Amino acid sequence: MAAVGSPGSLESAPRIMRLVAECSRSRARAGELRLPHGTVATPVFMPVGTQATMKGITAEQLDSLGCRICLGNTYHLGLRPGPELIQKAHGLHGFMNWPHNLLTDSGGFQMVSLISLSEVTEEGVRFRSPYDGEETLLSPERSVEIQNALGSDIIMQLDDVVSSTVTGPRVEEAMHRSVRWLDRCIAAHKRQDKQNLFAIIQGGLNADLRTTCLKEMTKRDVPGFAIGGLSGGESKEQFWKMVALSTSMLPKDKPRYLMGVGYATDLVVCVALGCDMFDCVYPTRTARFGSALVPTGNLQLKKQQYAKDFSPINPECPCATCQTHSRAFLHTLLHSDNTAALHHLTVHNIAYQLQLLSAARSSILEQRFPDFVRNFMRTMYGDHSLCPAWAIEALASVGITLT
């Protein structure tokens, strides 16, 4: 079945993105998202929560770190506790006691992560609940209905998600279906004045398919666009080229959300390529393995070398963990049954991600972004010859050289 050629019935979408500054050399941009629960400065990293909470950090702590937007998962929230209960709590904001913005995903990612539990048809995605085994259909209409009930500030279309390493007819089928499902999501969206529906660009690693998807989806006047179908095992060279292709064709006056990207180098490179929003479980997941994010990479605090190290994780980090605890203390906690270390590391790792993109934003505003990139790479890798070849190539494609 071919992609639907006529845009959906969405009324003129609100312009939620205000561009504040652009890098004179690369595609990097600094902006503001004007959302129902406040303004969000971009570029921005968005921490990920599954069931109305972040693992290892409270909403109050996220607030204190300066986080102004985070994610919730429609698939999990739709199953447990369910949208009806959350609606009674005045939406997800009230349920979480979160005063700032929320973005909910569509539930489509579980088509990849829970593939053994799902079946995809034109109707939607049929899941078997991992909680009770009950079968449920997540259609584009139901995904939007759940997200309308949750009351998030940004909602995502249901897309047909395939792993980035899949090739062949399934990728084309998924791309065309994602366009058709976008129109169904637009038609089902009942709260256009309060919630901003983003389209998700698909097409895998095939430039022609991704170009077709970009041309089709940008005909729809939605408030923003996500770049989907990446960060799933493809090579970094394939990854950056698809990101660059996407940002080259997306409208400049709308936000660009690169899904599932969280490694520091990836964030900096993709800001240079023109992306505004990022999310990933990486900072919280890596904390649970005793790993702390620092400008030079990661500290594996379980290692014996930190047993008598009384310095903070990062002396320049203002987070509560670095202001209060030493590496030696965290090392000791990690070797006990105490879960406090995971909490302290999560606070620090999220702070690191937020600070990194805040620093990138400041450099864009001050027209020194290329220098920011060079300093970041020098600190992370030492000599520029040790930087990943893909990153050097990607940065060069937008006019930033490291020498």
Swiss-Prot record:
Compartments reported by the entry: Cytoplasm; Mitochondrion outer membrane
Cofactor(s) for this UniProt protein: Zn(2+)
Positions bound to queuine: 105-109, 159, 202, 229
InterPro entries per the UniProt record, alphabetical: TGT, TGT-like_sf, tRNA_ribo_trans-like
Binding-site residues, Zn(2+): 317, 319, 322, 348
Coiled coil: none
Single GO biological process annotation from the record: tRNA-guanine transglycosylation
Gene3D superfamilies from the UniProt entry: Queuine tRNA-ribosyltransferase-like (3.20.20.105)
Modified residues (Phosphoserine): 139
GO cellular component, one term: mitochondrion
Transmembrane segments: none
EC number in record: 2.4.2.64
PTM sites of type N-acetylalanine: 2
Keywords: Acetylation, Cytoplasm, Glycosyltransferase, Membrane, Metal-binding, Mitochondrion, Mitochondrion outer membrane, Phosphoprotein, Transferase, tRNA processing, Zinc
Active-site residues per Swiss-Prot or TrEMBL entry: 105 (proton acceptor), 279 (nucleophile)
Activity sensitivity to pH: Optimum pH is 7.3.
An annotated Gene Ontology molecular function: metal ion binding
Catalytic activity of the protein: guanosine(34) in tRNA + queuine = queuosine(34) in tRNA + guanine
Function noted in UniProt: Catalytic subunit of the queuine tRNA-ribosyltransferase (TGT) that catalyzes the base-exchange of a guanine (G) residue with queuine (Q) at position 34 (anticodon wobble position) in tRNAs with GU(N) anticodons (tRNA-Asp, -Asn, -His and -Tyr), resulting in the hypermodified nucleoside queuosine (7-(((4,5-cis-dihydroxy-2-cyclopenten-1-yl)amino)methyl)-7-deazaguanosine). Catalysis occurs through a double-displacement mechanism. The nucleophile active site attacks the C1' of nucleotide 34 to detach the guanine base from the RNA, forming a covalent enzyme-RNA intermediate.
Self-association and partners: Heterodimer of a catalytic subunit QTRT1 and an accessory subunit QTRT2.
This protein's name: Queuine tRNA-ribosyltransferase catalytic subunit 1
Species of provenance: Rattus norvegicus
